[in-house]
Amino acid sequence: MSVPDYMQCAEDHQTLLVVVQPVGIVSEENFFRIYKRICSVSQISVRDSQRVLYIRYRHHYPPENNEWGDFQTHRKVVGLITITDCFSAKDWPQTFEKFHVQKEIYGSTLYDSRLFVFGLQGEIVEQPRTDVAFYPNYEDCQTVEKRIEDFIESLFIVLESKRLDRATDKSGDKIPLLCVPFEKKDFVGLDTDSRHYKKRCQGRMRKHVGDLCLQAGMLQDSLVHYHMSVELLRSVNDFLWLGAALEGLCSASVIYHYPGGTGGKSGARRFQGSTLPAEAANRHRPGAQEVLIDPGALTTNGINPDTSTEIGRAKNCLSPEDIIDKYKEAISYYSKYKNAGVIELEACIKAVRVLAIQKRSMEASEFLQNAVYINLRQLSEEEKIQRYSILSELYELIGFHRKSAFFKRVAAMQCVAPSIAEPGWRACYKLLLETLPGYSLSLDPKDFSRGTHRGWAAVQMRLLHELVYASRRMGNPALSVRHLSFLLQTMLDFLSDQEKKDVAQSLENYTSKCPGTMEPIALPGGLTLPPVPFTKLPIVRHVKLLNLPASLRPHKMKSLLGQNVSTKSPFIYSPIIAHNRGEERNKKIDFQWVQGDVCEVQLMVYNPMPFELRVENMGLLTSGVEFESLPAALSLPAESGLYPVTLVGVPQTTGTITVNGYHTTVFGVFSDCLLDNLPGIKTSGSTVEVIPALPRLQISTSLPRSAHSLQPSSGDEISTNVSVQLYNGESQQLIIKLENIGMEPLEKLEVTSKVLTTKEKLYGDFLSWKLEETLAQFPLQPGKVATFTINIKVKLDFSCQENLLQDLSDDGISVSGFPLSSPFRQVVRPRVEGKPVNPPESNKAGDYSHVKTLEAVLNFKYSGGPGHTEGYYRNLSLGLHVEVEPSVFFTRVSTLPATSTRQCHLLLDVFNSTEHELTVSTRSSEALILHAGECQRMAIQVDKFNFESFPESPGEKGQFANPKQLEEERREARGLEIHSKLGICWRIPSLKRSGEASVEGLLNQLVLEHLQLAPLQWDVLVDGQPCDREAVAACQVGDPVRLEVRLTNRSPRSVGPFALTVVPFQDHQNGVHNYDLHDTVSFVGSSTFYLDAVQPSGQSACLGALLFLYTGDFFLHIRFHEDSTSKELPPSWFCLPSVHVCALEAQA
């Protein structure tokens, strides 16, 4: 044997060994799910008997250990259970072949085997098999345990038959000689007929039968066979097998005396399969120790498993003292054989477990000392770790704590030996933790603050350093920080100046990746590492609470959120001064803090380190009321004297507040330090009264802070200034987060804005918001955030630069494009009298006169809580600085009629004034690409607008009495409507920015008239089909063509009557129109149509007919008769569509 089982105990001799292995590719999760269920069937009662069969499961077992199965039958693999995945019938033959290959590995010793197949369905599943079990999946397999019980019963049948065969051999029969692997060559050529040889054969067979009886649950019979074997083997000096017989006798006696087993707590393997360690159970490699089943427990009915009576058992069974003596004798026989080292080691371990139950520690230590010196060939690193770990556990089991710690540490160092390709730092760390009690080392810093130091500081520091290094290498920097913090806090007095520097530097390196906290760290084994506060870094000697500054007082007003209240309150805070000042820490101080305001505490500290100490995140720890600590940072010189430090915070509720201590971050480690735990501290009191206060509002925006500080004329202080740079027409949302960082709900909020820039003409709303959505979230509870969105939309008038474009036109530059290196800067160059030939360089570069600036102030007045009742409010002002650059603007606007009377073409000359290529698009046209400084014309076909349907504006209701203002307002309203319908947008792909291009300031009266939908809507129908746009009506020569003219009156007054004349003509496409068509076109009836008066929103129609005598293309021109009625209306009201009729040859 080459692989020892360090978890062996005496009761394992009565178990049957069953190997459970996967076949093919099976996930570890699925395998161990079934493996645990199989392990749950650890013992069964034999039918019609009081005997109990115990099973020991392995998911890996070295085949070379199986060769020792004749020497000790509990080492023989008698059962094989394989688990496999098979999802198709074509894979089944190969899977079954793999099962047979797996059986061949242990084939010489197997009693029976089973194959569990998951995933296969179909005809193969329906075929009855005893050695194969099919399951559709890993969830639907309820009969696994039942099949395992049947499998164990089949093992028992074979076991019982073998026991009976061996036990009933006649003395005259030839008994085979059982051998261990290394003996086979030694018996070649021996006289098999000699008496010595026969006794050897009989003695070994008796021992073998004893093993079988013990496994079959016949304890009394096994004792008898072991005694007979010992006598036979002792007579022939067969020492190896004599030792095995003695060990078997000891095992049977231990099972009798200690039915609860000898594994104890250290033998976690003895519990059910649910106790599988995560790391050990998930490895398939030689030498991996497995969790075993409890073979020493009685049956559930409490019946003794032995079929024999209790009579005579005491005579064959060894006493507890004799058990140990026989173990010593057996081990002494094993030691004679070099190849029996594993057997000797396991026997020592079994004896130690028995002695631990008997509480004979000194004798147990002798066995362990012997085990230490047993030579087991060249062990692998993993086997060394196992060996040292088990030695440590066994020493711990017998109460030798320091020696246990020694071997644990040796095992830990072996886990990370240089010869290991993948060092096991996690196992190393776990083992190092278990050595701490042996070195009188606790991981609770409170244990080092009471009394004198216990243990050897040098050894403890060495062990702490090893813990730090192991935790770092296993990828858990939080553990490294905690252990290093503990070392620095508890061992500071034992560290030299250089060691202090080294430890501090290491700690900073670790905390740069993982800061230290005050949270307990839970380790996988159930151990919890308590926090380590740095009460010595720095040392605090004096604490003093300070009064509030006057600048934090709220504003008082006569009417809450009134319009005429000054932002500077005349109220002067003057607390009542108490004259009974005391030095006691619990004395209340003679001033008050205000709820929600920043409060200050002064500490006098000094640095014990030989270098500059940087303390970050230093704040207060309080009780009595809710308190928000605002941390500070400081730097203390090396070994400094008393150094003043001011800590601030905000009380969140009213009442009495007590300053209990402070928290710090030193070397990246966060610490909570209580004043009661600081020796020699002085204070003038740490308790103060907190009066009710207002909520506190904190504003944060989505825009960057501005370097421009606005100075409103009202003298209000701007809390925050933000800036944004936009192109003209561009919109951006300013998202403001209103966070209530106070203690009271925010109940009232008023938002106002004031534009400080008045010289620029603004179109539309510069700043707009909807406060209702924000107020719907009120009252805003403490700690809550409300989002307030302000829309910033800049639409300025840059049309003044049209005059500058005219300068370029005067120079002969084409309006379709400007071939200039920097066209924009030349465009925006101010007009001067007499243009110079060579303008100075200063005018070419650095001229930013085209940028326009808008400035506004947003005021937030809010109140709530007790301050709201008392008439206080707070005021926050937000300054907004917007720089607007021109994007695109229109240099010329004109219109052209369209083919439809309800539409027209809007012609726009668009100029790109940016330095980037951009695209201009509308809702109905494709994008137009404009290079920097380029001007192009774009035509937009638009539906005409019904301006008369616009709702009345406030100006038309009498707010503006000036007719000029009324007309201006109407024009702006129409321009806004046209702008919204056109939807002209620009986009700069390189900057991913976009905006709107406005024509509001460029629409003159003529353009507006062309864009307006005529109040009289005329429709012409030929044979019932509308004629509009470019539609052509077809007819046949000689057939009358019905012509209908409809009028819809959308004006607010009655119109008509009207007389219309239809004039046909032909267009020769050369500018010549032929109206002489008397012989070609004939009217059925009159060529003049009459329409009666039409009321508002009414309709009227007139009918007529034409007869085309020849084929050809004809056009119908409808003329109005000039009379008093038609002259009163604008010409634009009489826009009839042209009619195009194609006369075709009549079909035969």
From Swiss-Prot:
What are the TM regions of this chain, as residue ranges?
A: none
Protein name from the UniProt record: Trafficking protein particle complex subunit 9
Q: Which domain of life is it from?
A: Eukaryota
Q: Which residues carry this modification: Phosphoserine?
A: 566, 953
Entry keyword set:
Cytoplasm, Differentiation, Endoplasmic reticulum, Golgi apparatus, Intellectual disability, Phosphoprotein
State the similarity comment. Answer: Belongs to the NIBP family.
Q: Which disease is it linked to?
A: Intellectual developmental disorder, autosomal recessive 13: A disorder characterized by significantly below average general intellectual functioning associated with impairments in adaptive behavior and manifested during the developmental period. Brain magnetic resonance imaging of MRT13 patients indicates the presence of mild cerebral white matter hypoplasia. Microcephaly is present in some but not all affected individuals.
Entry comment describing in which tissues the protein is expressed: Expressed at high levels in muscle and kidney and to a lower extent in brain, heart and placenta.
A biological process (GO) annotation for this entry? vesicle tethering
